[in-house]
Amino acid sequence: MLSNLFVIYLLFILIPNVLNLGFGSYEITKKGSIGWFYTANEVGAIISILMPFYLNEIINKKNKPIIFLSIIIIFYTLTTMGTKGPLLSFGIILIYYFIKYYKKIIKEKKYKTLGIMTTSFIIVILALMMIIPKTTFYKNIIIHLDFLKVEKISDFKNPKIIDHFIFSQRLTFLNNTVKIYNKSPISSKLLGVGYIDNYGTDQVSMKMIEMDYFDILFRQGIIGIVIIFGGIVMTINKKKRTKKINDVYLLSLFLSIILALLTGHVITSPSVSIYVALIIDLIYNGNIKEIENDKTRVCNC
C-alpha cells in the first residue's frame, strides 16, 4: 500500500516534468518542478517518508535490473524537483541499506561479493560526481551561493551565511519568534502564542519558523508539544520492548523526525502528518500483517 502510494506520487511529478507541464518548485530565482502538486516542501516530505517502503520492496525482490532502473528514475525525479529534503532522504536510505548488506556480507564471509559491492559503490560515487553538476539541484546551489556572494569556503564562517544557505533563514525566524514568546504571558507559554505575530499592529506577520518542533512549541505551547509528541515517545518505548517491528517503519519515522527539524512542513502539515500518523499507528499497534497483505514486503536480510 505505502509503496504503491510512493509510485503514484512519483509519477505525478515525473510525467509532468518530462512533458514540461509541472508547476515550479520556487516562485523566483531557483529552478525545479514539483509536477502537478502545489508546494515543494509538503510533497518533498511525503516522497521522503514513503520512499523507504518502495526501496525496501524492490530490494527484497533481488531483481538487479529493476533495482538499478528504479534508483535511476527516483534519482532523476528528485533532482528535477530542485529541493534538498528528498535527496537527503534518498541518500540516507541508500547508505542505510549499503551498511546493512555490507555487515551481512562480512558476517557471512562472502569476500567476492564484498569486492563487487565495494567496486560498484566506488563507480556509483564517481558517476554521481559527474552527473550531479548537471542537475537542477546543483544549479540551485550555485544560484544560492551567487546570491549570497560566497566565493570561498571561509565565507561560511559567517553565521548569517550558514543560516541563509543551509537553513533558509529559519534560525533568523527562530530568533524572532523566541523574542515574542519570551515577552508573552504564562498562558501563552502554556497554550502558545498562536500563528499571527504582532496582531493589531501595522507589522502583522504569519511567517512560521518552518522547523516543526519550534513551531509547535511556540505556536501551540508547552501543552501542545507534550500532547503531539507524547505519541512518538510512546512508539519508541514500544519498539524497545518488541522485535516484531521491521526496521523499514523506523527508518521512515526517523526521516520524518529529521525532516521535521530541517525542512518543516511534516508534523504541522495535514497532508504530510497523516502519513506520519499512519506509520506511528502501524509501529505502535504492530499491524504489520495488514501492510504485508497489500504486497508491501519487508526485507528480512
Question: PLM features: residue spans?
Answer:
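Alpha-helical transmembrane segments of multi-pass inner-membrane proteins
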Residues: 2-25, 38-103
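Long extracytoplasmic/lumenal interhelical loops at the membrane interface
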Residues: 23, 27, 34, 161-220
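Membrane-embedded alpha-helical segments of multi-pass membrane proteins
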Residues: 41-51, 88-92, 223-230, 271-279
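Hydrophobic transmembrane alpha-helices and their immediate junctions
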Residues: 63-66, 99-106, 111-112, 219-258, ...
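A membrane-periplasm/extracellular boundary helix in multi-pass inner-membrane enzymes
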Residues: 101-158, 181-183
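Transmembrane alpha-helices of multi-pass inner-membrane enzymes
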Residues: 249-260, 267-301
